[in-house]
A protein has these predicted regions:
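Active-site/ligand-binding-proximal alpha/beta "capping" segment
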Residues: 124-142
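Short glycine-rich phosphate-binding loop at a beta-alpha junction
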Residues: 51-58
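Short Gly/Thr/Asp-enriched flexible loops that form oxyanion-binding sites at enzyme active sites
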Residues: 63-72
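PRPP-dependent phosphoribosyltransferase catalytic core
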Residues: 2, 6, 18, 137-189
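Short, glycine/charge-rich flexible loops or terminal/linker lids adjacent to PRPP-binding catalytic cores
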Residues: 74-120, 186-188
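Conserved acidic residues
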Residues: 52, 118, 148
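Active-site-facing substrate-recognition patch
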Residues: 1-51
Length: 189
């Protein structure tokens, strides 16, 4: 998506350790008109899929997923990284390692909100090594739902998570794929 690539070049900041900061428009402060364009693009890409649920993981994916869901006119459900007192009933659970936070999370999702009747589109802001997506895919499989595919805003192609998932037959649609990053530049695929 050319608009996204231009925005990354204009406002993104490359940090040591293969970190790309896009917090001014994507995952801390959210530029709603811009994210609307992302939502329209995912709707265009998945127009042929019978999506009934958008799935993401807290926290950065939630805002994007909500905008995308408006174009499909379906609910968003998000996996939580922590148990809370207001969660009850049966849960799907998995462990997910975060590249950015260097932590392993126990991720949970209520069985009330995802089942065999669902056709799921997973939405997330970043794809690096694929751990978060693999965990969400495991939850979808455990629910008996159909995974229609994944929608990623920015994929770090040099970390090969997307390549690995595609090799497994998962439909991965990324709006911008970065093939290389140095401390002062990046290259798109």
């Amino acid at each position: 998506m050319q608009l996204l690539k231009e925005r990354i070049l204009k406002d993104g900041i490359v940090k040591p350790g293969n970190i790309l900061k896009v917090d001014s428009f994507l995952n801390h402060q959210i530029d709603i008109p811009f994210i609307n364009e992302i939502g329209k693009e995912f709707k265009r890409i998945y127009a042929d899929a019978p999506i009934t649920k958008i799935l993401t993981i807290e926290a950065s994916g939630i805002g994007i997923a909500c905008i995308v869901a408006q174009y499909f006119n379906v609910p968003v459900v998000f996996a939580k990284k922590a148990q809370s007192l207001n969660l009850d009933g049966e849960m799907y659970s998995t462990k997910i390692e975060s590249f950015t936070h260097k932590k392993v999370y126990d991720v949970i999702l209520s069985k009330k909100f995802l089942g065999p009747e669902d056709h799921v589109l997973i939405i997330d802001d970043f794809l690096a090594n694929g751990c978060a997506l693999k965990g969400l895919i495991e939850i979808v499989k455990n629910s008996g739902a159909v995974l229609e595919g994944t929608g990623i805003v920015i994929e770090k192609g040099f970390q090969h998570g997307g390549d690995m998932l595609r090799e497994e037959g998962i439909r991965v649609e990324s709006l911008a794929i970065i093939d290389s990053m140095t401390d002062d530049s990046l290259t798109f695929r």
